[in-house]
Design a protein with these regions (language model features):
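Small/aliphatic-rich secondary-structure junction motif
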Residues: 2-56, 154-212, 231-233
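Gly/Ser-rich helix-loop-strand patches that form or flank binding pockets
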Residues: 5, 99-149, 226-250
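Short active-site-adjacent structural elements
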Residues: 48, 220-221, 242-246
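A short acidic, glycine-rich active-site loop
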Residues: 57-70
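Short, aromatic/basic amphipathic alpha-helical patches
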Residues: 75-76, 129, 195-205, 246-250
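A short helix-to-beta-strand connector/capping loop
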Residues: 81-88, 203-209
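Charged docking surfaces used in two-component/phosphorelay signaling
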Residues: 91-99, 217-218
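A short, acidic, amphipathic alpha-helical segment used as a generic capping/interface helix at domain edges
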Residues: 215-227
Length: 250
């Protein structure tokens, strides 16, 4: 557990039908690390206001506000009741990326959770919001398969760009791994000379490491390995010394 204060877990939701899976998994993670959960949704203003008349536009915003509030509260309430954990739902209208950036700066979460979109081709960072968050948020990011089961014991965990020794600031990773399926899949992109000398993280048990040389298709290859090994929860751990390949994901 984090010293003094609870971990702040921020779940970014698009309120699609499978959003409940992402939120359920996030709340289970929060329970393991004794964290608190914020649920955040942004609706494009252009999707709400389509009338040129000011009065009609204001009425449309008000109607959408009530509808989104009801939907968000329903989602948070249903998961909160099942998992017995408080979820704070918040939403806003405007530019999606700007609103997310502002919310992150204001609330200062420790962990940001996003759902990984379904795709015919495996895509590690296919959604435009994911690379944006990776660029703007320097904390730790959880990418959760939207098809995942909410029970953390049934999860298959992957680590991307993890350091050789997961430090104490990342102790929540150890808590989650302890409840997940084994082995953990660790993915890293590195120079050939570095890759030849690297091995498994000695602080983690039952880790299968995949080290790829730097090249244009490295992330695509990792994505294929994720799909093959059915990894449905990926930890993206960034440090100040993060390599150009990792920061280049954005």
């Amino acid at each position: 557990m984090k010293n003094n204060n609870k971990y702040k877990v921020l779940v970014l939701s698009d309120l699609t039908d499978d959003s409940i899976n992402v939120l359920q998994t996030a709340t289970k993670v929060a329970q393991i690390i004794d964290g608190q959960v914020d649920l955040f949704h942004v609706r494009k203003a252009t999707n709400v206001v389509k009338q040129s008349n000011q009065l009609a536009a204001m009425r449309a915003i008000n109607d959408n506000y009530k509808a989104i509030e009801k939907e968000l509260n329903s989602l948070a309430g249903s998961v909160s009741e099942i998992d017995e954990i408080k979820i704070n739902p918040v939403f806003s209208f405007g530019n999606i990326k700007k609103q997310i950036e502002n919310h992150i700066e204001t609330t200062k979460p420790d962990i940001v959770v996003l759902g990984k979109r379904k795709s015919v081709k495996p895509a590690l960072f296919g959604d435009k919001i994911i690379p944006f968050v990776l660029k703007k948020f320097k904390g730790e990011v959880l990418l959760i398969d939207k098809d995942t089961v909410w029970d953390t014991q049934a999860l298959s965990v992957g680590l991307f760009n993890a350091t050789d020794n997961v430090d104490s600031n990342s102790q929540f990773i150890h808590h989650v791994i302890a409840r997940s399926e084994k082995p953990v899949r660790a993915f890293k992109v590195a120079d050939k000379t570095i890759a030849e000398n690297e091995g498994n993280d000695p602080t983690l048990k039952e880790v299968v490491s995949y080290i790829f040389e730097k090249h244009d298709d490295a992330l695509k290859t990792i994505s294929n390995y994720m799909s093959k090994n059915k990894v449905n929860l990926m930890f993206v751990d960034r440090k100040p010394s993060t390599s150009k390949v990792a920061t280049g994901l954005s």
